[in-house]
Amino acid sequence: MATGWEPDGISENEIADGEAYHRALYINGDIGSPANWHRESAERLVQLAIPHIKDGSLVVDYGSGTGGSAIELLKEVEKRGIEINLVLIDPLVSWFSKARDLLKGRPNVHFELSIEKDDSGKLSFRRLEDMLGGRKADVIISSSTMHLIPERAIRDLASQFSGSLKEDGVFIWDSGDLESEFRPDHSALLHDPYRAVREILRNDEIRASRLSEMSSEEVLQHEGRLDRIFPGPYSMDVILDALGAVGFSSETHHEVVGFSNDDAERFALVPRLSEIAAPLLPGEERDEAIRAALKIALADIAEQGKGSHLEYRSHWVYGVHRLG
């Protein structure tokens, strides 16, 4: 049985949020049927990690979400008859509780919630070395997480990775939402459609009416929070430079992954992500507004030559980093 963190007092809304994101990764929630974009992007990450994994390896999945990358990794190691110790780490209770539910029956799987609350109620991120209890990992993977880390925090996180790996350890990550000099002109970034939806709905009449009932300070805080759901992209060089500064070598890869319009809609309607349309009311009002805006956004991406009437092409980058 899995060990470590367990959800306590999770709400129905949080359960629904985790289930919706899981279904954005797996068709109808079936872990045997990953959505094309998840299958292709995770497959490359797993194949880069496998050569560094052997029986008994301690593998850390940093930013596990609902467990999508961990599930794909476990499929591959089991196929090869390899037994690993896997630590999943994430700060979001709603998504992480779904990962716990999916993997709770597996041995050698451990969960660590990466946020904690002090006596005053203030939340902060726990350090990786503390979550591992002094153990050193053979491999750290991180899927679709690095682009969500603020630039100012990357250097410290790189140091945590360095301090939490064995001398011959490796850090492997992927992202579909970082700028790079080798992104093909015919591809978009992973979150481009959803940032476009945010902009289209920014001046929606119903939204504007609801915002007008707030104070200017409330509007500023509200809109700032929404802008952070799909933050603007920065260069992958920020990450490579930070990792290099703490002693990592760097090897990079990239590929273009198709993201179907149907998958994009499922993704955009995940409750936590659909907050980009707030204060439109959750449910039909919000969902219909997002669907309409997403249709416009995807058509515009196709018009730019970065997709078709069926999908957009997302550009993914991968990093493999060794110490020494």
Regions found by a protein language model. Name each.
Residues 1-54, 68-72, 76, 172-210:
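Conserved class I S-adenosyl-L-methionine
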Residues 24, 28-29, 251-305:
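C-terminal helical/coil "lid" or tail adjacent to the Rossmann-like core of SAM-dependent
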Residues 123-140:
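A short acidic, Gly/Pro-enriched loop at the edge of an enzyme's catalytic core
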Residues 138-153:
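A short SAM/SAH-binding and catalytic strip from SAM-dependent methyltransferases
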Residues 155-167:
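A short glycine-rich, Lys/Arg-flanked "PGG" loop and its adjoining helix->strand segment in the class I
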Residues 199-278:
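Substrate-binding/catalytic lobe of Class I Rossmann-like enzymes that use SAM or dcSAM, i.e.
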